[in-house]
From Swiss-Prot:
Its EC number is 4.2.1.59, 5.3.3.14. CDD domains: FabA. It comes from the Bacteria. Disulfide bonds: none annotated. GO terms for molecular function: (3R)-hydroxyacyl-[acyl-carrier-protein] dehydratase activity; trans-2-decenoyl-acyl-carrier-protein isomerase activity. Keywords: Cytoplasm, Fatty acid biosynthesis, Fatty acid metabolism, Isomerase, Lipid biosynthesis, Lipid metabolism, Lyase. Homodimer. This is 3-hydroxydecanoyl-[acyl-carrier-protein] dehydratase. InterPro entries: FabA, FabA_FabZ, HotDog_dom_sf. The active site is at H70. Belongs to the thioester dehydratase family. FabA subfamily. It catalyses: a (3R)-hydroxyacyl-[ACP] = a (2E)-enoyl-[ACP] + H2O; (3R)-hydroxydecanoyl-[ACP] = (2E)-decenoyl-[ACP] + H2O; (2E)-decenoyl-[ACP] = (3Z)-decenoyl-[ACP]. Gene3D superfamilies: Hotdog Thioesterase.
Length: 171
């Protein structure tokens, strides 16, 4: 069977309900925490390290929920939501590869913010470069990622780590 290499919003919503990779396996969060509108490219090879690559997008419009509360009179998308989107994509990649378990963000190395996402922006692009997938008792994905707004790179994160757990009881 040929793997799908792009996903539209409806398919990402199916993933948030546990319907894309099967029960008990990787899920994306549901709206409002789903920070993606589409995955335009996902592959097992490619990226900076030749271990896989994802490119995803979020359409920006002024009525997104976070602009009302962060901050009143000075609306900006919280940087932590861009970071979370990168973790979401690393977990999505692990599920897409067919690995079992529920995803949990496990940390990252250095994160740099050099810009902001404002309500008048058009599109956010996430670019994930998989560095390693460890498949032992724990499935662990490690990646570097960037966030760009309207073509300008504004966040960088290295060593994004996401694990897949078949049981989260002792997590």
């Amino acid at each position: 069977m040929t793997k799908q290499h792009s996903f539209e919003r409806e398919e990402l919503l199916q993933c948030s309900q546990g319907e894309l990779f099967g029960p008990g396996n990787a899920q994306l969060p549901a709206p409002n925490m789903l920070m993606l509108d589409r995955v335009v490219r996902i592959c097992e090879e490619g990226g900076h390290y030749g271990k896989g690559e994802l490119i995803a997008e979020l359409d920006i419009h002024p009525d997104l929920w976070f602009f009302d509360c962060h901050f009143p009179g000075d609306p900006v998308m919280p940087g932590c939501l861009g970071l979370d989107a990168m973790w979401q994509l690393v977990g999505f990649h692990l599920g897409w590869l067919g690995h079992p378990g529920r995803g949990r963000a496990l940390g990252c190395g250095e994160v740099k913010f050099s810009g902001q996402i404002l309500p008048d922006a058009n599109k956010v692009t996430y670019h994930i470069h998989m560095k390693r997938v460890i498949t032992r008792r724990l499935i662990l994905g490690i990646a570097d990622g960037t966030v760009s707004v309207d073509g300008r790179e504004i966040y960088q994160a290295n060593d994004l780590r996401v694990g897949l757990f078949t049981s989260t009881a002792n997590f």
